Amino acid sequence: MATIEGTFEKSSSLKVAIVIARFNDLITNKLLSGCLDCLSRHGIDVSESSNQIDVAWVPGSFELPIISQELARTGKYEVLITLGAVIRGDTPHFDVVVSEASKGIATVSRETGVPIIFGVLTTDTMQQALERAGIKNNLGWSYALQALEMGSLMKAVT
């Protein structure tokens, strides 16, 4: 029996795109910082002049799938990370945005064969979102680790 796993080693050559929602940017900027910190610590050049990473801003989480699709189709990236923050309000808008964003991102990943990390926080309150994007527990770091592992795993199976 073969065991196939992704690793975090030899990830310094990985080409990554991050698609990030501007809505709730107090949160998404923190997620981006955590993400970039993790990638940098694993050898990926995250400087402004880097040819390893690109960051695309979209208005909100609902728009993440379409830009992810276009970036994945370029063939330039080995993995994408989507970042967003959807906080429950008094209307059903939350449910619609979360449902469509998650389904859309999953569909794009399956159809293009490019792993896309779903880094969209879905919380009931702003406080919950801040806790998940904070200094002690920044999920942006975790999303970047998932991207490194999936990039490595895809290389191992293809």
Swiss-Prot record:
InterPro entries: LS (IPR034964), LS/RS (IPR002180), LS/RS_sf (IPR036467). This is 6,7-dimethyl-8-ribityllumazine synthase. The active site is at H93. Pathway: Cofactor biosynthesis; riboflavin biosynthesis; riboflavin from 2-hydroxy-3-oxobutyl phosphate and 5-amino-6-(D-ribitylamino)uracil: step 1/2. GO terms for biological process: riboflavin biosynthetic process. It is an enzyme of class 2 (transferase). NCBIfam families: lumazine-synth. Catalyzes the formation of 6,7-dimethyl-8-ribityllumazine by condensation of 5-amino-6-(D-ribitylamino)uracil with 3,4-dihydroxy-2-butanone 4-phosphate. This is the penultimate step in the biosynthesis of riboflavin. Coiled coil: none annotated. Transmembrane segments: none annotated. HAMAP family: Lumazine_synth (MF_00178). One of its GO terms (molecular function) is 6,7-dimethyl-8-ribityllumazine synthase activity. GO terms for cellular component: cytosol; riboflavin synthase complex. Keywords: Riboflavin biosynthesis, Transferase. CDD domains: Lumazine_synthase-I. It catalyses: (2S)-2-hydroxy-3-oxobutyl phosphate + 5-amino-6-(D-ribitylamino)uracil = 6,7-dimethyl-8-(1-D-ribityl)lumazine + phosphate + 2 H2O + H(+). 5-amino-6-(D-ribitylamino)uracil binds at F23, S61, F62, E63, A85, V86, I87, F118. Its EC number is 2.5.1.78. Belongs to the DMRL synthase family.
